[in-house]
């Protein structure tokens, strides 16, 4: 009986595809530009607020709300990502993407016009709701607009260029706050987002969808009642409960509440129960109705790609958050110059994202790039963990470039693996899971990195500067501790800071090593990803 049900629910492969006319030439360039701008804005929105928070809290007298300015966005984004993937399978691709962009823009406008802290938090939550479908939609649009051989290059361009926002965000936030107003950290999204929307509206984006003999229906214009019947709202509620509780536990643990407090333990237990019930419910309703079909989530290529992207994001954000701390706290440079010092990593990442994408598109081999990424980024993080106050310019330039080189090699490979493993009309669901893995993995590793850094800094102060108050150094912050530390003890405190930062990059070593392991599960080593199979590592599973 069980085997019969499993066989019945297993999605059938599509034998024929609708013949589509892909976008070419200038129009394709405009599509790539538009979706890259949108993803850039989304990532910028997540990082630009960092340097604006002191001014926001001063104006609204809301120091106690600082954590919510980031977590409100994260909570709504994580909770809605699988639902966003489901919507892309039910509705017209371009207009669904524009709807998510519109919600993101409304949230940005609310943040910019906020008259109190509560209004700003609501705006951040609304922006997160819109952002939940942007990266997924951008990748799906590229998959629809271009033939498979071009997609690795285009995805590499989009992901490589948009990641600049993670580093540029704090710099732009500081510039807007200092020379204009913190409100422009959010208002900047409005004209750029409107430009991207106009470009997309002017271009016809085809639907590359197989015939209807597959389990999931093709994207189409349907009524509200039909949409609601297909959305698996109970599944959404259960998954949202899991996402909200696990995110709050990570956000509050160690700061607002002790890790062993009843609140944090209760959140973890509630998240676990919600996830288990969600899994049983999705299995019960079957592949055709589930928000996350079991046949999608259980695919080896899919869950390995999600885990790859989660650990990849953890390593990336460790570099992005703690290298500026090293440059500003230890090297004593301005925020602007710390951004300049990050350019070697950004440059290597952009170049290799484009180069690897082009080569994958020509050869079809993507697993070797994922494996190389794990190795190279692990080595880079290990080298960065040796940073000291007097580390030479040549060393930190080369170590960063190596890290960017490695990240560029592998950043688009999990998306390609998912697109290969699933039928086109199911790929949006798989990519939405990958985006959740990326968001959740990044959040988890930032929480762990914060704990490791604090522990390493405290240990370093006890070892190198026992006469200095650890509480005073921590309270002064990474750019203010020089004002509270005696000049004769500053060099010892810098060593302590290096120890905290170095220990943090041990996490990046581990995360990158994990990407190497999960890369083996993303497909065959010798595989032409657009269909032709060659002899390689193991046997590839196909839907």
UniProtKB/Swiss-Prot annotation:
Its main location: membrane. Keywords: Membrane, Transmembrane, Transmembrane helix, Transport. PROSITE patterns: MFS. Pfam families: MFS_1 (PF07690). One of its GO terms (molecular function) is transmembrane transporter activity. The chain crosses the membrane at residues 30-50, 90-110, 125-145, 153-173, 185-205, 233-253, 261-281, 307-327, 340-360, 364-384, 394-416, 428-448, 509-529. Induction: Expression is controlled by the monacolin K cluster transcription regulator mokH. It is a multi-pass membrane protein. GO terms for cellular component: plasma membrane. It comes from the Eukaryota. Monacoline K acts as an inhibitor of HMG-CoA reductase involved in cholesterogenesis. Its hypocholesterolemic activity might be useful for lowering cholesterol levels in the blood and reduce artherosclerosis and coronary heart disease. It is found in: Membrane. Efflux pump; part of the gene cluster that mediates the biosynthesis of monakolin K, also known as lovastatin, and which acts as a potent competitive inhibitor of HMG-CoA reductase. Belongs to the major facilitator superfamily. TCR/Tet family. This is Efflux pump mokI. It comes from Monascus pilosus. The lineage of its organism: Eukaryota, Fungi, Dikarya, Ascomycota, Pezizomycotina.
């Amino acid at each position: 009986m069980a085997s019969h049900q499993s066989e019945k629910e297993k999605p059938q492969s599509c034998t024929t595809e609708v013949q589509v006319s892909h976008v070419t030439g200038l129009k394709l360039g405009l599509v790539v530009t538009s979706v890259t701008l949108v993803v850039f804005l989304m990532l910028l929105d997540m990082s630009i607020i960092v340097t604006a928070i002191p001014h926001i809290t001063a104006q609204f007298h809301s120091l106690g709300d600082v954590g919510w300015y980031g977590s409100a966005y994260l909570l709504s984004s994580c909770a809605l990502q699988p639902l966003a993937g489901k919507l892309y399978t039910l509705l017209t691709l371009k207009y669904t993407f524009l709807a998510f962009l519109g919600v993101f823009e409304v949230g940005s406008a609310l943040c910019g016009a906020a008259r109190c802290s509560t209004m700003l938090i609501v705006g951040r939550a609304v922006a997160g709701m819109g952002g939940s479908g942007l990266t997924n939609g951008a990748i799906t649009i590229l998959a629809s607009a271009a033939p498979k051989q071009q997609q690795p290059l285009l995805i590499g361009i989009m992901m490589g260029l948009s990641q600049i926002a993670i580093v540029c965000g704090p710099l732009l936030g500081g510039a807007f706050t200092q020379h204009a107003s913190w409100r422009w950290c959010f208002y900047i999204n409005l004209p750029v987002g409107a430009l991207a929307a106009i470009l997309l509206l002017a271009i016809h984006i085809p639907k590359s969808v197989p015939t209807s003999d597959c389990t999931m229906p093709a994207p189409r214009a349907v009524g509200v009642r039909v949409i609601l019947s297909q959305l698996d709202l109970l599944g959404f509620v259960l998954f949202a409960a899991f996402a909200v509780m696990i995110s709050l536990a990570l956000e509050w643990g160690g700061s607002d509440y002790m890790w062993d407090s009843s609140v944090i333990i209760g959140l973890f237990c509630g998240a676990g129960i919600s996830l288990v019930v969600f899994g049983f419910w999705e299995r019960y309703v079957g592949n055709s109705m589930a928000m996350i079909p079991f046949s999608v989530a259980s695919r080896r290529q899919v869950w390995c790609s999600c885990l790859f992207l989660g650990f990849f994001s953890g390593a990336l954000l460790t570099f992005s958050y703690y290298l500026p701390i090293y440059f500003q706290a230890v090297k004593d440079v301005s925020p602007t110059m710390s951004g300049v010092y990050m350019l070697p990593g950004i440059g290597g990442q952009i170049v290799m994202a484009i180069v690897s994408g082009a080569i994958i598109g020509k050869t079809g081999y993507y697993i070797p790039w994922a494996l190389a990424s794990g190795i190279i980024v692990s080595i880079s993080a290990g080298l960065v963990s040796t940073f000291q106050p007097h580390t030479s310019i040549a060393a930190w330039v080369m170590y960063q470039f190596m890290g960017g080189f490695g990240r560029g090699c592998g950043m688009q490979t999990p998306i390609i693996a998912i697109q290969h493993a699933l039928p086109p009309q199911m790929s949006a669901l798989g990519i939405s899971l990958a985006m959740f893995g990326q968001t959740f993995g990044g959040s988890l590793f930032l929480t762990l990195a914060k704990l490791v850094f604090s522990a390493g800094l405290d240990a370093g102060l006890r070892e190198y500067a026992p006469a200095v108050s650890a509480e005073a150094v921590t309270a002064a912050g990474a750019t203010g501790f020089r004002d509270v530390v005696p000049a004769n003890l500053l060099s010892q405190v810098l060593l302590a800071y290096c120890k905290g930062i170095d220990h943090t990059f041990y996490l990046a070593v581990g995360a990158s090593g994990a990407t190497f392991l999960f890369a083996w599960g993303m497909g065959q080593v010798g595989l032409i990803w657009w269909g032709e199979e060659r002899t390689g590592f193991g046997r590839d599973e196909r839907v």
